[in-house]
Amino acid sequence: DIETGKTKGNFDGGEDYGTLTADYLLQKMKEDASVVAITSATPTVFGFTKDKREQAGRQFVDVGIAEEHAVALASGLATGGAKPVYGVYSTFLQRCYDQLSQDLCVNNSPATILTFCASVYGMNDITHIGFFDIPMVANIPNLVYLAPTCKEEYFAMLDWAVEQKDHPV
């Protein structure tokens, strides 16, 4: 509603990708010690509440407000045989463009980057608009960009991204 600024639909109460992601990754971590979740000071963006971070233990790394370091860490871990998954708000992805292109993609490191809130609705103030991630990364060689349309596609893409060893996703 333009006059009130409130959305007309009710989006509360359903499943959210953050919770789905954390539950998925915790299960993968139980099955495979090489799976590592990485965040840059926003663990709840992909569902890692305090108790879920404790469940993950050493397989969860928060680098603080250091998106560049998170991508460099993911690249290094992937090169060493781990299966890193970095969860980041779309709007913060711009902070690590050099690391995405030079550390991750030039080396073709098979890390997984999960971008959240990539829309006008996701984070809707003037400094946190998150819809420029696709045009920003579209020209980076070796990077595979996937965009699921439903939960089932999301899980299929996650399975493929985490297990494949050929490209950053």
Question: Could you tell me what each predicted segment is?
Answer:
Residues D1-V169:
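Thiamine diphosphate
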